[in-house]
Amino acid sequence: MTENTKDTPESETGWRCAVCGFLFSGERPPRSCPRCGSPGAEFLPAGDHTVFRYDGEPFDVLLINGSSHRVGNTGFMLDCAAEELNARGVSFRRYNLSEYSIEHCWCCYSVKAEYCTYPCRNWQDDMPGFHALLATAKAVIVASPINWNNMPGRLKDFLDRTTCMQNLFHLDKPGLTEGKVVGILVCGHEDGALKTALDIFLYFQQMGYILAPFGIGYRTHGAEFNSSTDSGFFRNDQRVREDIKGVVSNVVEFMQLDIESQLKGRLAPVSE
């Protein structure tokens, strides 16, 4: 049962808010979501969900937007990152986690280490596709907002689900991510940026990723301002663009050293 219960004429389309799931019928999305207030750009055509799987085409850098909002400030940071990658001729793929179905980790490891297998036992959602992307990409750049001095729950679910990749050495299998490069971008209204970045990095560190030199970029606005002004601040602040360009450049330079190949088979995995 949808919340917009009027009959849908043939000329109208169903739209779903990617943030809260509100369903709307009309020729175009509403200007803002009646339930969560998100702008109309957050709406996607409604329809049956197709399980996401990696198509196997090679690429270099994986861009992950961990925010609930596809087109908010975190999305803007990835816009800037994508712009720099394009300028450098580096292939990449970009994903907004809010568009995908990623369930909570089942915590099989807590029952017995060997029960946490790869591929993941939960193959019914979209995460197996992301596991394959992580195994393929030479580098990852994660962009995150700040929620209560930490990453949002959506991103944490995504990172929790990488446990099966970190756990490969318990199964006497070779790692798939050791020596890859990671960069982290964080934005928020107030404080908690560096803590958020380090919390994110901890997951990647345990998978064998190497943080690019100067690989963390962050910016906050300020508690004295209304959060409605954050968008204009980030988009008009030259420092934001320069820092993102720097992080992306550092990730690419480090990635192109091909340290992953140099370290292959030489690292000793250590559990957290």
Label each residue range with its predicted role.
Residues T2-E3, G21-F22, R35-G37, P45-D172, ...:
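N-terminal beta1-alpha1-beta2 submodule of the flavodoxin-like/Rossmannoid cofactor-binding fold
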Residues S11-T13, P29, S98-S101, E178:
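Short metal-coordination and nucleic-acid-contact micro-motifs, chiefly zinc-binding Cys/His arrays
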Residues R16, S32, H104:
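The −1 position to Zn-ligating cysteines in a subset of zinc-ribbon hairpins
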Residues R28-P39:
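Cysteine-rich micro-motifs
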Residues L97-E103, P174-L176, M207-D230:
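Mobile beta-alpha loop/short-helix "lid" or hinge segments that flank ligand
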Residues L171-G217:
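Short, glycine-/small-residue-rich phosphate/pyrophosphate-handling segment
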